[in-house]
Amino acid sequence: MPLEMFMFATTRMALLIGGAIGGATFPLFAQETTKNDTVIVTSPVQSGATKLATPDIETPQSVSIITRQQFEEQGATSVRQAVSYTPGVYSNQIGASNRFDYIVLRGFSDGSLDNVYLDGLKMMGDTNSHSSLVVDPWFLEDIEVVRGPASVLYGRSSPGGIVALTSRKPAFDAGGEVKLFAGNNNQRGAAFDVTGPLDDNERVAARLSGMTRYADSQFTPLKEERYALMPSLTWRITDRTRLDLMAYPHRDPEGGSHSGLPYQGTVVPYNGGKISNTFFEGEDDYDKYDRRENMVGYNIEHLFDNGWSVRQKLRYLHTKVTLNQVYAAGWLNETALNRGYSGSGEKMSAIALDNQLDGSVDTGAINHRLLVGIDYQDRSNHTTGYYGAFPPIDAFNPVYGAQPDYITLYSREKHKLRQTGYYLQDQMSWDRWRFTLGGRYDRVSVSNIDKLHDSRSDLDKNNVSTRAALLYLFDNGVAPYLSYSTAFTPTSFADENGNVLEPMKGKQWEAGVKYEPPGGNSQFSAAVYRINQTNIATKEEPTDPYRSIGEIESKGVELEAISHLSDSVRLQAAYTYTDIRYKKSSPQEQGKRAVYAPRNQASAWLSYDVKSGLLEGLTLGSGIRYVNGVTSDRLNTHTLPSYTLVDMVVGYDLSSIGLNGLSAQLNVNNLTDKRYVAACNSLSYCYFGAERSIVGSVSWAF
């Protein structure tokens, strides 16, 4: 169906249904307090797990909400850094590389580049290429980490969960901020944000945010450079109709490093020596990652007189990526590493569309909050790939300036993906009980077109995803729950014969409990789960073709505490236990643990605000992150050494000395400058963790 006809038909259908249905009044913009008979609950609100604003304590799924205050205080410069204190998450998959937001959820690394959503729509990157997209945290209001399958609402997604980003929207109260920052490794940059109404009637508001950042990479001489803007506009067309517009031009002319080095030489000595954690194995003239992202989108929402609402979200993106990389390819002799070359030129366009209708009806004593939706995704990526070889390099005494032995064209492809999904969700309330039922039907088409060899591989699949969950709200703030959900993950990955792999499928059982002390400002949660996924797409080395294996199982425990211990003291703590193993695979891998999945993780962040006295306005904070049990390869040949990282912040609000709106902050990550290896893909590719980072900033809010 042509896109224009699809949009018209689905929008018309939603409007007709919404106009015809009667029911109880339901607010267009959900509040944080919900009432059902005598039960009143006040809780932080999430929307990532249900697509509707729902109190977290009424949500029968593990959800973590990272506020802007949290990730700014911790000095996060990427989404993966912003979620590093969150349970169920491993954000150090490729160590010090800042090129992509790798976020491993519940041990599943196959979706670590494809599980991010912005304002409810999938980011639409192509993980079978180098066209993976990022959004800088400067443009975000909050981040929700939804753990466990989300296919019932979002279609294709990892069984480990999703990361739902919310962008900063225009406000009708005028204000803004200007920020300057600088630090070690030649870090420097600036950012601004300004918002306010455009008319006296407060019908139209606008926001313009922008930033630039530059740094020397840990792996000199590579650089990291970024420029981005986000203009947005909100128009209250009527008292019941609202339109939000946004754009996001983003440029990374220098994408830093993405290097991997052998286990011998990084984790353990090789020939009596260890490679420096700043060693660059490439060639400056042949190493570059240039990414250009351009997004435009809208969200239009209308509230009917009967309390039902209809909305449509759409985003279009176009990206261009250029990659040149010289990489290590194993030891040649006692000191020298072999080197290969990989290059790619990519142009991708995509559209994501979601039509939603929601409202409430009562059937006797049960209230039904219904959501009906139709969404559509269309992505096309044109890629041209090159490979080659470079002369070896001495890893302990490198000399640069080599020219390639050869570089040759090896692929010219077009990756196409289309998905149409129809979904229904019913959030039922009866006294203190909460029931959630959901179902979704997907039609997915994937094509890989090999232009170089005039061949193609196609895959057309239909799938049904389901979810059922039960939760009970005790009057003391305790809410136990049990849930079952399924996952559906088609990809454009191809095997050695060029055939598109069968979609991965998963199912999860999860049980947990949430606790919010009455009258307090704290949230505690605990969850246990088991996820089974079949048709796993995997490969031995980053340069190998993909292959499909039978089944992988992830079992784990997650604990989280977010607490304001007083008006001045805030605590964020988490613990994660993950046991993810191949259940049906080759005899060598059977029962082995998956890579990129720590067995144990623990973290805590404590901050203190001085409210009075000579030090009024001072903020002190520190965090600790512990990681244990990362395996070296799929055969579990070794286990990487555990590591502990310490972070800290010192901030000062200069308003206390009469400089209204002015503040300063110093962030230090990896305070002890610990040298460590964060993860390995195999014994040939291990990734150093980030060295110490020191950044000072000055901000003026007005």
Swiss-Prot record:
GO molecular function, one term: siderophore uptake transmembrane transporter activity
TBDR plug domain boundaries: 55-168
Signal peptide: 1-30
Main location: membrane
Residue span(s) of domain TBDR beta-barrel: 173-702
Taxonomic superkingdom: Bacteria
InterPro entries: Plug_dom, Plug_dom_sf, TonB-dep_rcpt-like, TonB-dep_rcpt_b-brl, TonB_rcpt_b-brl_sf, TonB_sidphr_rcpt
Topology class, membrane: Multi-pass membrane protein
GO cellular component: cell outer membrane
Keywords: Cell outer membrane, Ion transport, Iron, Iron transport, Membrane, Receptor, Signal, TonB box, Transmembrane, Transmembrane beta strand, Transport
Compartments in which it is found: Cell outer membrane
Any Gene Ontology biological process: siderophore-dependent iron import into cell
Homology family: Belongs to the TonB-dependent receptor family.
Function comment: Ferrioxamine binding and uptake, in association with the TonB protein.
Descriptive protein name: Ferrioxamine B receptor
Organism: Salmonella typhimurium (strain LT2 / SGSC1412 / ATCC 700720)
